[in-house]
Design a protein with these regions (language model features):
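Short beta-strand/loop motif that positions the catalytic acidic residue
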Residues: 26-28, 32
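Loop/turn elements at helix/coil->beta-strand transitions in domains of secreted/extracellular proteins
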Residues: 1, 20-24, 60-65
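Residue-level signal for short, function-critical loop segments
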Residues: 7, 30, 70
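C-terminal catalytic histidine-bearing segment of alpha/beta-hydrolase fold enzymes
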Residues: 55-128
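Primarily recognizes the serine-hydrolase "nucleophile elbow" in alpha/beta-hydrolase
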Residues: 1-21, 125-126
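Conserved alpha/beta-hydrolase "acid-adjacent" motif
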Residues: 33-49, 79
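Extracytoplasmic/secreted cell-surface and envelope-processing proteins
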Residues: 9-13, 34-36, 75-79
Length: 128
């Protein structure tokens, strides 16, 4: 599973899995104000973001890789596929080689594309 700035809605408290979930790659901006990076919960209802889900996976022993995209907002939902090396690494290790790892990493893109570049199919000089 590839999750870019995603979350799970639950009306029964924190998410529970009847079966072991597939290995999951989470990528989420820590400044996301659209979908919670962590969680929003009111009584038994809640929206559980990547940080909360990764913590749940860790406690339950499920395989996952969680990239916190430092300083990024919900744009990660649009730019997740701009990280082919991380995605290829995850698919190779977790899916094809069946590694059962749990990984948390912080990714701070020092050469981040300007926001307007995300709306173009590919950010190249030809598209400017």
């Amino acid at each position: 599973v590839l999750s870019f700035a995603g979350a799970i809605f639950s009306h029964e408290g924190r998410p529970r899995y009847r079966e072991t979930p597939a290995p999951t790659l989470f990528m989420h901006g820590d400044k996301d104000k659209v979908v919670p990076y962590n969680k929003i919960q009111l009584f038994s209802k809640g929206l559980f973001g990547s940080k909360s889900l990764a913590r749940r996976f860790r406690k339950a022993g499920y395989p996952y890789a969680f990239f916190t995209m430092q300083g990024q907002t919900h744009d990660v939902a649009l730019t997740g596929m701009y990280h082919p090396d991380e995605i290829t690494w995850f698919v190779r290790r977790y899916v094809f080689e069946h590694h059962r790892w749990q990984m948390n990493a912080e990714l701070d893109e020092l050469d981040r594309l300007p926001r307007e570049a995300y709306s173009k199919p590919y950010a190249t000089d030809a598209n400017k």
